[in-house]
Amino acid sequence: MVETVVVAKVTVDVQAVKMDADTSEPILKGVPLKVSDFDKNAMEEALRTKAKLGGKVRVVTAGPPEARDKLRELIAMGAEEAYLVTDARFSELDYAAVGKLLAAAIRKLGKIDLVLAGEASIDQYSGQMGPRLAGALGVPSVSYVRKLTPDKEGLVAEREMGDLVEEYRLPYPALVTLTKEINEPRLPNMMQIIGASKKPITEWRADTLGVAPAELEPAVRLAGLRGIVMKRRNVLFADEPPEAARKLVEALRGEGVLGGGQK
């Protein structure tokens, strides 16, 4: 049997975020939360591993208390247990601190063979939590895996790197982050959704996990967020087509888009 933990992130729905016209800052108040899309691929792969080799599938997330309800989506997919790691200062924590909390939570679960996560989160897409977590747990890891073949002794992970396909063999315990191409996450039915709404979610705080406040002091603080403002130039040539084409070519050369213009 393979004991598997899926590490998921509950974050804002980036498709619903709007920008303040005056400050160019994102308006996050009132934006709904969602499970990061890539983490549903991780859950699907965990469930396929369970179907093949047995074991239990659990999900762990670190986030605000509001993340509880979104965890139920992963329970509905098939997770048998769900754990929420939170802290009063959660919004101030950096990746290193969150990694320490998640590592402590996974260790508290006991014997774990396989940790799966999405390649990155949909909000910041840094892709650093998987390697950080593997380092904190002291286990081998591979990121951006597009094909996973687990067996009783370990797993084979395949990923694309440029023009190459790399294949790795890892023993258990191991941590793997997965790309969206690896599978198509299942959609739970109504009975599974209703059943998930009744299952308990265990909540752990930093002190519960034995993580001291000093260990959570952020080394990096987010100073601010601003949207990128794209300025478009609408240049119209109202001449006859041959003359308009000539002016267009001259304009593109002047901008350095075509050869023969400014550098």
Feature map (PLM): residue ranges:
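N-terminal glycine-rich FAD/FM-binding segment characteristic of electron-transfer flavoproteins
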Residues: 1-263
